[in-house]
Amino acid sequence: MAEESNKLAFPSVVDRYFTRWYKPDIKGKPCEDHCILQHSNRICIITLAECHPLLQNEKTIKSISYQISANCSRLQNKVSGKSKRGAQFLTELAPLCRISSTDGEEYTIYSCIRGRLLEVNENILQNPGLLKEKPSTEGYIAVVLPKFEESKTITEGLLSQREYEEIVQSRAALRSETVQAVY
């Protein structure tokens, strides 16, 4: 009983050390939301938001590919040294990976922020279920380091957790109105 109350009293490591930022409806695609976990040392972790279609509707992930084009694979990213030499530079709309589901849908996951790609999560290639089971921890997509000068401004186009929750609630209300209108 005491152990159960401790779980409720203490926030998770992610909630304790990271600030959640959201980018809803990437490239105008409804509900394709991304979450950016920003640490105080300015490192950002790109994940899927809770409302992303891959995490909803009992979808099963078929494959994940970091091969963006014939000449660009995020797996070829080799970073070294204090200044992170060799890291691929990303823009806000730079694709990180493509995820296919068993129902034939394909989703492109974008960087959402400008910065250097420090690492991609190769564990999800062997175990794609991590994306659904632990999207904010072991199922992350990539780690990005924004430029020092831009680290304060990268969140300008992103939503806070409270703002994002308001959008999710308005979507739910809109959906329920649509369902009621059909009947």
UniProtKB/Swiss-Prot annotation:
Main location: nucleus
Keyword Nucleus: yes
A single MF term (Gene Ontology): actin monomer binding
Alphabetically ordered keywords of this record: Cell projection, Nucleus
Subcellular location: Nucleus speckle; Cell projection, Lamellipodium; Nucleus; Cell projection, Growth cone
Pfam family, one: GCV_H
Entry superkingdom: Eukaryota
GO biological process: dendrite morphogenesis; regulation of actin filament polymerization; regulation of filopodium assembly
Keyword Nucleus: yes
SUPFAM superfamilies cross-referenced by the UniProt entry: Single hybrid motif
GO CC annotations, alphabetized: dendrite; filopodium tip; growth cone; lamellipodium; nuclear speck; nucleus
Role, per record: May regulate actin polymerization, filopodia dynamics and arborization of neurons.
Family named by the database record: Belongs to the ABITRAM family.
PANTHER family registered for this protein in UniProt: PROTEIN ABITRAM
Record-given protein name: Protein Abitram
Organism the protein comes from: Xenopus laevis (African clawed frog)
